[in-house]
């Protein structure tokens, strides 16, 4: 079977780190689109899954590209495509499916501990308490109707699932260079910026690499969906052949 074809909706406003990071972490054929342009695929057909990246925008801002992106994502969900949102993408998926995104009134940034429930395919092989880099001042305040919270910490919900849709608030794709660049770009007190920079160490990055497993797990989920669709297609084809044979026998 060929590698899965994934639509990557890049919402990162020309940040050079974002495409590099997702190309490195996603072992798939990627079709990349600049959502801010706005540039979106003409159709959801031809893709096996969708990834929505982070962004410096807020989901609730009145920017002309945000709602078309949400509408396209809803179409992909309705078509049964597995979706993964990261940070802003996590929030957009929640918003698109009827959840609530709100300002936190504070900033979570740096390598932080997060806890997951231990029974999700997304976190298979990840310790229930794990480390990941975080940077956000908005949160999914309420997950979409019918969704399950998969992970959280003392700041916010950090992962949810609804059917074939997964969102993670943390950044499993970040390398140390990205973590430093993002931190230096924040409008925060100098002392806090320095504390976060001091925490971007090889040891903390090594600990956070465990969180990258969510990409492998999500792609494995995509493959399972593909295989199920192929099996279903074969079964439907066999049923049609049986029906045609029965019709032919009746004609005789």
Stretch-by-stretch model annotation:
Residues 18-19, 42, 61-63, 93-96, ...:
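Short glycine-/acidic-enriched loop or helix-start segments at secondary-structure transitions
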Residues 21-23, 47, 64-67, 98-101, ...:
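Short, glycine/charged-enriched secondary-structure capping and boundary segments
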Residues 156-205, 221:
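A glycine-centered loop/beta-turn motif at secondary-structure junctions
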Residues 53-120:
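Cysteine-nucleophile active-site neighborhood
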Residues 1-79, 196-252:
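N-terminal beta1-alpha1 cap of cysteine-dependent amidohydrolase-like domains
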């Amino acid at each position: 079977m060929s590698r899965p074809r994934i639509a990557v909706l890049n919402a990162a406003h020309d940040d050079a780190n974002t495409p590099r990071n997702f190309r490195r972490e996603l072992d798939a054929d990627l079709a990349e689109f600049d959502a801010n342009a706005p540039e979106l695929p003409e159709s959801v057909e031809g893709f096996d899954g969708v990834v929505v990246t982070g962004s410096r925008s807020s989901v609730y801002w009145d920017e002309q590209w945000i709602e078309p992106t949400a509408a396209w994502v809803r179409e992909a969900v309705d078509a049964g495509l597995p979706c993964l949102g990261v940070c802003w993408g996590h929030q957009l998926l929640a918003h698109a499916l009827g959840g609530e995104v709100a300002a936190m009134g504070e900033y979570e940034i740096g390598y932080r501990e997060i806890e997951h429930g231990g029974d999700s395919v997304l976190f298979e092989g990840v310790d229930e308490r794990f480390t990941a880099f975080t940077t956000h001042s908005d949160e999914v305040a309420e997950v979409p109707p019918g969704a399950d919270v998969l992970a959280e910490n003392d700041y916010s919900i950090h992962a949810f699932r609804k059917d074939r849709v997964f969102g993670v608030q943390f950044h499993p794709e970040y390398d140390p260079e990205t973590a430093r660049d993002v931190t230096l770009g924040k409008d925060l007190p100098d002392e806090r910026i320095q504390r976060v920079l001091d925490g971007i160490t090889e040891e903390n990055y090594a600990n956070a690499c465990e969180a990258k497993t969510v990409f492998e797990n999500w792609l494995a989920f995509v493959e399972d969906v593909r295989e199920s669709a192929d099996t279903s297609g074969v079964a439907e084809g066999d049923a049609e052949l049986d029906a045609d044979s029965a019709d032919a026998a009746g004609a005789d």
